[in-house]
Regions:
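Short, surface-exposed beta-strand-loop junctions and turns on beta-sheet-rich folds
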Residues: 50-52, 71, 133-134
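Hydrophobic alpha-helical segments typical of transmembrane helices
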Residues: 3-7, 52, 93
Length: 137
């Protein structure tokens, strides 16, 4: 699927995402994550022993919610699946993502079991509501 340029722009900025994976009993597990985007695929890194990786190895389906950091009324909802679990022990993908969020390489250098997920988007919805984020003081 070719991503809408507005979705790509939202994913390309340092916005936090929340990934939902499925537990063995079918219940959801949601985790905040950093993400990257390349060639209409979403990139995400984690440790091999993390719950989200274990869940995705068992069932590669996932959902992502991404909200603009400065305008929480701009968001994307994404469904997809992991199409590749790639070794990232050299932190090539993780550092690329970390630079986007912090301007620095990823600080925790634990290469054993470092994995990058390559996620194929199956459905994406972009929304921008006409509201100003002005919560009461």
């Amino acid at each position: 699927m070719s991503l809408d340029p507005k979705v790509v722009a939202l994913l390309s900025r340092p916005n936090f995402a929340h990934i939902a994976t499925l537990m063995p009993d079918g219940s959801p597990n949601v985790t905040p994550v950093w993400i990257g985007v390349r060639d209409d695929k979403i990139l995400l890194c984690s440790g091999e022993s993390s719950l989200k990786i274990r869940n995705l190895r068992r069932d590669p389906r996932l959902a992502l919610s991404v909200v603009d950091f400065h305008d929480p009324y701009e968001e994307a909802q994404i469904r997809g699946r992991v199409v590749e679990f790639r070794d990232d022990s050299k932190f090539e993908i993780m550092d690329e993502i970390s630079y986007k969020y912090t301007g620095k390489p990823f600080p925790f250098r634990n290469p054993e079991g470092r994995v990058a997920l390559i996620i194929k988007v199956e459905k994406a919805r972009y929304t921008k509501l006409p509201f100003q984020h002005t919560p009461p003081a």
